[in-house]
């Protein structure tokens, strides 16, 4: 019998809590990640008021230096710890896959200087369209269409760009390049990026509409991902008949593997929280696992090195946390964590190699305190033990610590 009938895992994308022990092996603009500290530096430079996460125990997580504006709680309502990544990567897919029980020993390839001519030329030859070379670099998805959409409308050239993650994205105005054509181009791009030196996690079709100065991305986005190389706990749950619900980009990250119910992409963190709450309210969701990713922290503020915006985004989530809890049942478990860091005060624009926080809450708790410090995959091991399925490759369950 399950200790908790439902477990809800919410990933606050990039909300790290201090440099990992191996941060010296990871870099931003030539600077090692050794001094990165997403929550610490936001708290220090912009101030941080997250009283609802404080109640659960966020300020009680062990740190060399306490979070400046996040107090400790004498009698928290939950259990907390921080977790270390063992996989050789600090990207979204690697973090999420490890959280679900896999050790990624060979990271995907990322292209901080843009894609090589060999890849671009192949796409041009296949599509019969030129590629705008100036867009070929890590770029905000909205900024890239603002900057190059007018040129695309005039020439029909492709907007090919990347990000901090191992992805190749192609943006196309739906009136200039039909969605079906864009999909075929992305399918081809997927076929040529399945092995090194260009092993990419996802190819993403990014259609948009509108006029210069007023472009809008449409719901016709399509992801061409690779599936995890081995079963994750999501697969073990699905195979055992335990429903799994994906909110946000979770379904894309796992290429649908082990997902029984995809609740759709998020338009924003707030929309994602709305979707999570609707998921919690589903009458048929009496037992199972929900997995939510809230990406605005990372996409809108971490990469853009905007600590004040990041702070406000954390405030927004914290303000809505009581709504999530109010829609949980007595025997539900809420786990709040991250997938990597992205210190908005740090050098460069890439993710940062950090510990991630873990907050555990249930209305059924009679105790509180610290969970032993462990690794990302401890989450998957805990979920697996709760539902009585086999664990994946790695991880130690902390289920027994939750009283």
From Swiss-Prot:
It comes from the Bacteria. Binds 2 manganese ions. It catalyses: 2-deoxy-alpha-D-ribose 1-phosphate = 2-deoxy-D-ribose 5-phosphate; alpha-D-ribose 1-phosphate = D-ribose 5-phosphate. Mn(2+) 2 binds at residues 298, 303, 351. GO terms for molecular function: magnesium ion binding; manganese ion binding; phosphopentomutase activity. The keyword S-adenosyl-L-methionine does not apply. It holds the Pfam family Metalloenzyme. HAMAP family: Phosphopentomut. This is Phosphopentomutase. It comes from Streptococcus pyogenes serotype M6 (strain ATCC BAA-946 / MGAS10394).
């Amino acid at each position: 019998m399950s200790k908790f009938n439902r477990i809800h895992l919410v990933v606050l994308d990039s909300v790290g809590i201090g440099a990992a022990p191996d941060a010296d092996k990871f870099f931003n603009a030539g600077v090692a990640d050794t001094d990165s500290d997403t929550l610490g530096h936001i708290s220090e430079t912009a101030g941080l008021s997250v009283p609802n996460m404080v109640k659960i125990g966020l300020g009680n997580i062990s740190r060399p230096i306490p979070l400046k504006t996040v107090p400790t709680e004498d009698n928290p309502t939950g259990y907390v710890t921080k977790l270390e990544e063992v996989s050789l990567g600090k990207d979204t897919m690697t973090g999420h896959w490890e959280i679900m029980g896999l050790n990624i020993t060979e990271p995907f390839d990322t292209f901080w200087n843009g894609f090589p001519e060999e890849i671009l030329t192949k796409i041009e030859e296949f599509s019969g369209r030129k590629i705008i070379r100036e867009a070929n670099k890590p770029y905000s998805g909205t900024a890239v269409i603002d900057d190059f959409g007018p040129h695309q409308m005039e020439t029909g050239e492709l907007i090919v760009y990347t990000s901090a993650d191992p992805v190749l994205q192609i943006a196309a105005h739906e009136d200039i390049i039909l969605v079906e054509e864009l999909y075929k181009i992305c399918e081809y791009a997927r076929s040529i990026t399945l092995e090194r030196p260009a092993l990419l996690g996802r190819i993403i079709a990014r259609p948009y509409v509108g006029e210069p100065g007023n472009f809008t991305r449409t719901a016709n986005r399509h992801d061409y991902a690779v599936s995890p190389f081995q079963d994750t706990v999501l697969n073990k749950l699905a195979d055992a008949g335990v429903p799994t619900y994906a909110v946000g980009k979770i379904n894309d990250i796992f290429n649908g593997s082990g997902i029984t119910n995809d609740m759709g992409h998020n338009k924003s963190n707030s929309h994602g929280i709305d979707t999570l709450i609707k998921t919690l309210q589903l009458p048929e969701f009496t037992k199972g696992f929900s997995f939510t990713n809230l990406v605005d922290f990372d996409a809108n503020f971490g990469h853009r090195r905007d600590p004040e915006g990041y702070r406000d985004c954390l405030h927004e989530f914290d303000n809505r946390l009581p709504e999530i809890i109010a829609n949980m049942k007595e025997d539900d478990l809420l786990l709040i964590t991250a997938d990597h860091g992205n210190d908005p005060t740090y050098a460069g624009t890439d993710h940062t190699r950090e510990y991630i926080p873990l907050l555990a809450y249930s209305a059924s708790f009679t105790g509180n305190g610290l969970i032993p410090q462990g690794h990302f995959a401890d989450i998957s091991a805990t979920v697996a033990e709760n539902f009585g399925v086999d664990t994946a490759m790695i991880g130690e369950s902390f289920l027994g610590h939750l009283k």
